[in-house]
């Protein structure tokens, strides 16, 4: 079984052919700055992949996109990509590869699902004699999006890049919400009097912790670099203002993560995206802020890790959306259905 996975981020459009074992057999990527119209960008990546994997071998299509999105209508409206607003993505893909099922979810939802399926979540041994918890209603009754990983029942995936997006995987099932937009953690308010956000609110996490927001703040303090990658390099070189920008972003992210953990009893947060590629410059102050601000006891067990799959996490999660499922096992303690 081979499926086509599509991943639309703030700066690039990626595609891959992925097998049921999670092997990537072909891939393509187009920078959105040079991609032209959405239809042209889609055509470029699909044509590059199908030049290496015959189109008739592709049995389904999974898409992860920056949001908001409308899975029922098949449209995407990424906040930071104006030309993609209300673009009928699933219909456009369906015209290129007719007759295949198409599934759409948020890019961070797919990243979390990809990590759950093929990533390196630390596994925690069960306590001796402990009974396995019953699966959630979604895991027992739903179609079974994604496999379960021991020790990580409730995962938040976060993409920190041009924007800040999020998505939940609970008991192996992406929780999408009634409109498909659950997990927009970048639009939790962390500073009510803060900068206006493109979403229409003010003081969102995204206005503090996204790459462009960090760069704007540092420049206001006298830094003269070009972008978030240069900001990370300056922080590593000892620039006080660059380091402060990362600490400020880390504080905002820690507040948002603790908020989500208090609501959903999370045990893992997996962070990816261009800003997360800064490594310890971001994760050291983030983990410090998490430790200093933990409140309720159960939130102190929350673990924050960088994605182990890098840029492939979103593609693998999108593939998992499209792969065939085994029927769910509804016995107590059974894992939800997984890709065959």
Show the residue positions of the predicted features:
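Residue-level detector of high-confidence beta-strand sites
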Residues: 27-29, 79, 113, 177
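ATP-binding/phosphotransfer module of carbohydrate and carboxylate kinases, centering on a glycine-rich
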Residues: 1-60, 70-73, 91-101, 117-152, ...
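Short beta-strand segments
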Residues: 7, 62-66, 105, 156-163, ...
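Structural signature of FAD isoalloxazine-binding scaffolds in flavoprotein oxidoreductases
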Residues: 181-184
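Glycine/small-residue-rich loop that forms an oxyanion/phosphate-binding "nest" at active or ligand-binding sites
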Residues: 103, 109, 113-115
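Short acidic, glycine/serine/threonine-rich loops at helix termini
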Residues: 115-117, 169-170
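Generic beta-strand structural signal
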Residues: 100, 153-158, 162-166, 170, ...
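A charged helix-plus-loop insertion that forms the helical arch/lid used to bind
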Residues: 74-86
């Amino acid at each position: 079984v081979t499926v086509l996975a599509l991943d639309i981020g703030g700066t690039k459009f990626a595609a891959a052919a992925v097998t049921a074992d999670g092997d990537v057999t072909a891939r393509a990527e187009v920078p959105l700055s040079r991609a032209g119209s959405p239809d042209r960008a889609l055509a470029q990546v699909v044509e590059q992949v199908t030049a290496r994997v015959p189109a008739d071998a592709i049995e389904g299509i999974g898409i992860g996109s920056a949001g908001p999105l409308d899975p029922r209508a098949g449209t995407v409206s990424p906040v930071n990509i104006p030309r993609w607003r209300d673009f009928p993505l699933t219909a456009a893909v369906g015209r290129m590869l007719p007759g295949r099922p198409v599934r759409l979810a948020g890019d961070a939802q797919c990243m979390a699902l990809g990590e759950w399926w093929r990533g390196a979540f630390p596994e925690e041994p069960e306590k001796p004699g402990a009974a396995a918890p019953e699966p959630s209603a979604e895991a027992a009754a739903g179609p079974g999006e994604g496999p379960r990983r021991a020790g990580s029942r409730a995962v938040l995936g976060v993409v920190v890049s041009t924007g800040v997006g999020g998505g939940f995987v609970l008991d192996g099932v992406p929780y999408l919400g009634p409109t498909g937009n659950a997990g927009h953690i970048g639009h939790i308010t962390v500073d009510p009097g803060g900068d206006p956000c493109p979403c229409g609110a003010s003081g969102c996490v995204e206005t503090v912790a996204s790459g462009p927001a960090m760069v704007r703040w540092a420049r206001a303090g006298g830094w003269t670099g070009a972008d978030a990658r240069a900001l990370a390099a300056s922080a590593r070189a000892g620039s006080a203002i660059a380091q402060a920008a990362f600490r400020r972003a880390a504080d905002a992210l820690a507040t948002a993560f603790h908020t989500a953990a208090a609501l959903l009893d999370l045990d893992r947060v997996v962070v990816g995206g261009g800003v997360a590629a800064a490594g310890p410059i971001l994760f050291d102050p983030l983990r410090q802020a998490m430790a200093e601000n933990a409140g309720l006891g159960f939130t102190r067990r929350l673990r924050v890790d960088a994605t182990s799959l890098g840029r492939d996490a979103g593609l693998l999660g999108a593939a998992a959306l499209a792969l065939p499922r085994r029927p769910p096992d509804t016995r107590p303690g059974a894992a939800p259905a997984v890709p065959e």
